[in-house]
Amino acid sequence: MRAPPKHLLEPLNPRQRMSLLLIDEVPDRVVVYPLVTAHAATIAGISVRRTVTEGKSMAIAQLAAQRYYKHDALSVFSDVGLIAEALGSKLYYREDDVPVLQQPVLEHVEQGQDLSLPEAASLPGRYEVYIEAIEMLLREAGDILPVMVFIPAPFTTAALLRGTEDFLVDTLLDPESCHRILELSFKAGLDLADLCIEAGGIPMLVDPLASASVISPKTFDDFAVPYLKRFSDYLHRYDFDVFLHICGRSEPILHGIRRTGCDLFSCDDVSLELCRSRIGEEIRIIGNLKPTDLLEETPEKIERKVEAILAAAKESPKGFVLATGCEVPIGASRENLLAFVREGRRRGMYWGKEE
């Protein structure tokens, strides 16, 4: 009889490891969670288009990728336009890449007052893809792996209802109408989160268009933070720890991250030492290998970068998750991602010696 794979001989399984982190206990090692989303399609030999339009295909791809890389969580995610599409925006579907905005539903910002919330129970748009994927992943691996579900946050959804550039101009010229669109986006986000929680998923808010690479700190404070805070308050009623992911530059908005109410912050382009010093006493940090490194570097360089990341943040006071700063690129080197996970597990030990 063959011995079980080494990753199954660890003291804790991934779900136990994440659970200890979330109750402020020290797990056996750092949670290793590269954001493997559309890249999973390449491992399963399925088109990206199928994984974002078929729940079963998404789940099959996630399971195949996790078996291959041995990372610590599964990810249910298609694209940030999911809610905007359900509210009427049109997306353009590509065979081997994620959908992109083709036509926002709002030609003028004032039209936001005419938009209505779809009936969540009818699973508008592609919501059924999410629910089917969550249910299948829970059946197949939910006892040992957390099933993370990426929920587009209100600011990002609002921008995709209007068109990002137009919406940013609108925040200056007609903030009142922008807040009406944000309120609708917030309520639609809650509806999707409810469905995903009821199916068994763990929500993670994703707000890429609220990045300091896109908007100013003032716009973040005025138009993103209030809705993230209300979303966090809502999820806390479920007794969930709130995960928030904002890619791109984060340093200019770190002051506002605390006010979002999140419990875990997934960061991208920011010094982990700075992140740790500013928010690490209150918020668990998730990060932050540059996704492009998985395309451009060698496995040996990835190992050195993981070592540096862990040196900077492994002992963050509230806790740390080793992750990529954003989604793993579709064409990422498999050898590089294997090196990332392997080195994270080896150097991320808290109990006893390194593997």
Predicted feature residues:
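Short, structured active-site "lid" loops
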Residues: 50-60, 67-69
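Residue-identity detector for glutamine
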Residues: 16, 62, 66, 102-103, ...
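Glycine-rich, N-terminal phosphate-binding loop and its surrounding beta-alpha-beta segment
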Residues: 62-90
